[in-house]
Design a protein with these regions (language model features):
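Small-residue-rich hydrophobic transmembrane alpha-helices
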Residues: 49-113, 144-166
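Helix-terminus/linker motif at the lipid-water interface of multi-pass membrane proteins
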Residues: 27-53, 59, 77-78, 115-124, ...
Length: 231
């Protein structure tokens, strides 16, 4: 007979929450940036430029997210099979690939910042604000790839609580204080520097988390021999 498996529902929910939190943080960060820009001189043009930039940045985000959705089942299978070598191999591949993808996106956006903004708006003032906003948003864009990869990996190894924490740091815990304070002190320049400042802290936290991820995953996979759960 059909009946819901609450354990399975809980597992699926826990796995999906960090990704949902990242999306929520992106939306909150966008709203707070508009609020921070509102009191500034020429606010209308800044907000219009930021709207264009967000569309472009989200394209890059979706590319990375799509790749990570492919990485997660591979890493999960290796972890569930307690194949330590394959798991760490998949982690290394995902790390390199996510960094490569985000670096490529950043390079393209920085080099083509002006033409890309012109695709959406031809107002020279908006184009000028937009190109600098776009450069500032992707200057340290690998932070997004690294953070999302670490979030997915911590989910995979069962440390969903820490994965949830990582999902909040880039556009939440770190970005929000900067976007609420820097524009008040430095005007539009404060908006330009808010994302790079948050990305620097994100990279530091993620780098410090790699060691514990390796220890937790290795300890979990070595705790029960392969095939023991089938006995």
């Amino acid at each position: 007979s059909f009946h819901p498996s609450w354990k399975l529902i809980k597992t699926v929910t826990v796995i999906g929450i960090p990704t949902a939190v990242i999306q929520i943080c992106l939306s909150v960060a966008s709203s707070l940036t508009n609020i921070a820009a509102a009191p500034l001189p020429d606010a209308d043009n800044i907000i219009a430029a930021y709207g264009v930039v967000q569309r472009l940045v989200l394209i890059g985000c979706y590319v990375v997210m799509g790749f990570m959705q492919g990485y997660q089942p591979v890493a999960s299978f290796a972890f569930g099979a307690r194949d330590e070598d394959r798991f760490h191999q998949s982690v290394r591949f995902a790390l390199k690939a996510s960094l490569l993808l985000t670096v490529l996106v950043a390079v393209v956006y920085i080099l083509l910042s002006r033409p890309l903004i012109l695709l959406f708006n031809q107002n020279p003032v908006i184009v000028d604000y937009g190109r600098w906003l776009l450069v500032s948003q992707v200057a340290l864009y690998p932070a997004f790839g690294l953070c999302y990869m670490m979030t997915i990996t911590y989910q995979t190894i069962g440390a969903s609580g820490y994965g949830l924490f990582l999902s909040t740091i880039r556009q939440g815990l770190f970005y929000v204080p900067f976007i609420l304070t820097l524009p008040k002190l430095f005007g539009v320049t404060g908006i330009y520097f808010s994302q790079p400042a948050a990305d620097i802290l994100t990279i530091l936290v993620c780098m410090l988390s790699i060691g514990s991820m390796k220890r937790i995953s290795s300890a979990s996979m070595r705790g029960t021999p392969k095939g023991a759960d089938e006995l």
